[in-house]
Structures are given as C-alpha cells and as structure tokens.
Amino acid sequence: MAENGAAEGTAQQPQVQMNILGQFIRDLSFENVMAQKGVGGEVQPDVNVQVALDAKKRSTENQYEVITKLNIESKNKAGGEVLFVLELEYVGIFNIAGVPEDQLHPFLLIECPRMLFPFLRRIVSDISRDGGFPPLNLDNIDFVAIYRNELARRQAEAPAEVTN
C-alpha cells in the first residue's frame, strides 16, 4: 500500500523542464595591457576572477534571461603590473517549466549559469590565447556559494536600509 502512495505522490509533482533556447555574448572586452606598455620578460600571472549573476523574466511565458558577468584581471605577481583585463557578459535564454515559484530564483541563478559555464570557459580560454597569453582555463565556479553570499549580503544590507 505504501508503494502505491509513493508512486501517486511522485506522479503529482510537476516535471521540471529546462531548455536553452539561445546563448550569446552580449558584451566582450579584452585589453592586453602588457603589450600596450611594452612590458616584456618573464612574468608570473596572478589572476583574479569576479563573477556576477542576474536573471529576468522575458515577455514570453516561461522564458527567462540569465546573465553571467565575468571580470578577469591578470597581474604580474612580482611587480603588480596589470597584464590583461577581460570582461565578458554572457547571456542564456531559457524556457523553464515545472519549477515551484519559491525555488525559481535559486534555480535561475545556480542551475542556469552552471549549464552555460562550459561555454564561458571556452570563450575565456580562446580570448586569452588569441590575446597573446597562454589559454586561461577557469576553475569550476561554485554558483551555490555565489548565490548564498549574495543572499547574505542583501540580508546584511536590509536592516541598514530600514533604519535609515
């Protein structure tokens, strides 16, 4: 009897569906500072990667736009000179159905960027290589940690806004 109840409960839950309808580079900038300044010789890069995420509903039902912004700065460890700066804004258009409303926000800012990440990694690798540097292969990004940090930051700011 319990097996039937479990099967019925599973059948009632909506099936989550996610399709990537499109993905594209919205904005891309690469600046080879090292070449512009004529810096040469042996360098040891120190790479700093900053990630920002955003999502918004589109006018079509169940469609969302998810934006991943990367700001990457590579500096020489020895002198601190900037070697290159790469800024990338990458967008995915998703059709999402069956996700409960209270879980949609984390789904958009965790699962969708996770699906786009291999493409971002490839673009960063190609651009850094084509810019005259060894290919920069990004480590995996923990989108769950980024989401939690952003929630904590917003909660910390909320009491400050109420008292002002």
UniProtKB/Swiss-Prot annotation:
Signal peptide residue numbers: none
**BP GO terms, sorted:** protein folding; protein tetramerization; protein transport
Tell me a Gene Ontology molecular-function term this record carries. unfolded protein binding
Q: Does the keyword Transport apply?
A: yes
Q: Which UniProt keywords apply?
A: Chaperone, Cytoplasm, Protein transport, Translocation, Transport
InterPro entries per the UniProt record, alphabetical: SecB, SecB-like_sf
Q: Which subcellular locations apply to this protein?
A: Cytoplasm
GO cellular component terms listed in the entry, alphabetical order: cytoplasm
Its function?
Answer: One of the proteins required for the normal export of preproteins out of the cell cytoplasm. It is a molecular chaperone that binds to a subset of precursor proteins, maintaining them in a translocation-competent state. It also specifically binds to its receptor SecA.
Family statement drawn from the similarity comment of this UniProt entry? Belongs to the SecB family.
| PANTHER family in the cross-refs | PROTEIN-EXPORT PROTEIN SECB (PTHR36918:SF1), PTHR36918
For this entry, the protein name equals Protein-export protein SecB
The gene designation is: secB
